[in-house]
Amino acid sequence: MKIIHTADWHLGKILNGKQLLEDQAYILDMFVEKMKEEEPDIIVIAGDLYDTTYPSKDAIMLLEQAIGKLNLELRIPIIMISGNHDGKERLNYGASWFENNQLFIRTDFTSINSPIEINGVNFYTLPYATVSEMKHYFEDDTIETHQQGITRCIETIAPEIDEGAINILISHLTVQGGKTSDSERPLTIGTVESVQKGVFDIFDYVMLGHLHHPFSIEDDKIKYSGSLLQYSFSEAGQAKGYRRVTINDGIINDVFIPLKPLRQLEIISGEYNDVINEKVHVKNKDNYLHFKLKNMSHITDPMMSLKQIYPNTLALTNETFSYNEENNAIEISEKDDMSIIEMFYNHITDKELSDIQSNKIKNILENELRKED
């Protein structure tokens, strides 16, 4: 049996004011073409299909087109669950009718102990839910963390587990120790959001969404597919794609399959003049770029100048102000006032004080000392 595991499409995502629908349409077209080659028995989408609970019409249309090609044209069964970014009611609309074409949409807990059986494999679904939603569903005020809530869910599923079959869990959550990125919205505020791996022991394999790094956690049976695209500059350099999971004679194996996007996220560090004069290495000028540059304090509108050469510049950081706080605190504590000012001026401008500037500052310091006396 072959299963394709994907998640975190985040359709409609806007990064630093840039709408990413073109990039998402490109990668979904590539994904569909790959599925023609893969010919999987089923595709699992583990949450966050949309980036917001109220996606745009274009984002909705893009999802409908992709699912239509996969499910109706290629006739591949699909299981999808809601993530913390998805609007449950919107994603679940028409779900009972879609099941006639083996498109299974799960957005709540009403069927957590009723697996979807495909080719003898039982797929249990555990869509994203807040702590308060789990507390309300189980009518249990003692549930105060995701760990407690998910544990209660697994306890509900456990009596239904067929130990003679392969049992797979699909969920959208954070496993303790998983690598996070800036584009993942926190699941909770003020409570512990991660879940310990041991809670999943009753399952043969676990397919997760939420964390965007495909290797967020090192485990033989608990896997994240990662997002289809890089969605924050903290993800720059990360491979993106999907997981191919195979089951042969009861043995489960998986491999990550990378996809090449239309554009990547790239971070460029260096001198402002070198970048403007194109003396730095950039993989692709059309990539989405975050520049971290020195010596640009004198430039009136550096972002506009950069965009004339690098049209998809999305972020600019003035590196002049970055420093090692601990080391500088120790160094400054051993300096006199004049030396500190000289160091600060050099740090900001990369120049030394002129004799005229030094004399003026010395006079000011001497006058202040006289006032204190």
From Swiss-Prot:
Record InterPro entries: Calcineurin-like_PHP_ApaH, DNA_Repair-Maintenance_Comp, Metallo-depent_PP-like, Mre11_N, SbcCD_nuclease, SbcD, SbcD_C
GO aspect biological process, one term: DNA replication
Keywords, ordered alphabetically: DNA recombination, DNA replication, Endonuclease, Exonuclease, Hydrolase, Nuclease
Transmembrane segments: none
A molecular-function term among this protein's GO annotations: endonuclease activity
Family: Belongs to the SbcD family.
Function comment: SbcCD cleaves DNA hairpin structures. These structures can inhibit DNA replication and are intermediates in certain DNA recombination reactions. The complex acts as a 3'->5' double strand exonuclease that can open hairpins. It also has a 5' single-strand endonuclease activity.
Oligomeric form and interacting partners: Heterodimer of SbcC and SbcD.
Protein name: Nuclease SbcCD subunit D
